[in-house]
Design a protein with these regions (language model features):
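Catalytic nucleophile serine of serine hydrolases
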Residues: 26
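Conserved alpha/beta-hydrolase "acid-adjacent" motif
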Residues: 119-124
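Flexible "cap/lid" loop of the alpha/beta hydrolase fold
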Residues: 30-38, 44-72
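Short beta-strand/loop motif that positions the catalytic acidic residue
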Residues: 106, 112-114
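Catalytic histidine-centered segment of alpha/beta-hydrolase-like enzymes
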Residues: 143-152, 156
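Active-site nucleophile elbow and catalytic-triad environment of alpha/beta-hydrolase enzymes
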Residues: 85-102
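Catalytic histidine neighborhood in serine/cysteine hydrolases
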Residues: 131-146
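Active-site loop/oxyanion-hole signature of alpha/beta-hydrolase fold enzymes
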Residues: 1-23, 157
Length: 166
């Protein structure tokens, strides 16, 4: 995760953007939050869709595992070693002593959006929205986790509204 944050910052600097809206889906939503905490001066807002939130709660994991087979299959070519490394770096982030203080004092507006039919419980996103000073939370009804794939028109309007809304 630390490398991904550094990569985002390098891209921002290379293209000469002063501030930007950082949007992400799933792990990318959590990355957007981490990036905003580490580089608040560069982030106008965060849009996190169907993220996990910085937690390793057993009940969350059990619900995720129990419902996995019910989700639409999205065939994404990925490298298992990279996926494992990203998971490990996420765990390292959740164990940081200053994690919650950094979130609670981050002045970046953050919009957390849950997918209504996601097997991932949305309570961590609602908690984050309540924790960060300028947090908002909403649920998009009747869409699964990967609704960018299953409902692209809903995805497009969700992202557009989130980036242009209050």
């Amino acid at each position: 995760m630390e490398q991904a944050v550094a990569d985002l910052e390098a891209i921002r600097a290379a293209v000469g953007v002063v501030t930007w809206i950082v949007a992400g889906h799933s792990w990318g939503g959590d990355l957007a939050v981490r990036y905003a905490v580490d580089h608040p001066e560069a982030v106008a807002a965060v849009v996190s869709i169907a993220g996990r939130g910085p937690q390793r709660d057993q009940t969350w994991s059990e619900a995720y595992k129990a419902g996995r087979a019910t989700q639409p299959v999205v065939d994404i070519d990925h490298v298992p070693e990279v996926h494992a490394a990203l998971g490990d770096s996420f765990t390292e982030w959740t164990h940081r002593a200053d994690l919650w203080r950094g979130l609670a004092t981050c002045g970046v507006p953050m919009y957390f959006i849950a997918a209504g039919d996601d097997i991932r419980p949305s309570w961590p996103l609602a908690q984050l929205a309540a924790l960060v000073p300028h947090g908002r939370f909403a649920t998009v009804a009747d869409v699964p986790h990967d609704f960018w794939f299953t409902h692209p028109e809903v995805w497009t309007s969700t992202i557009t509204d989130a980036c242009t809304g209050p």
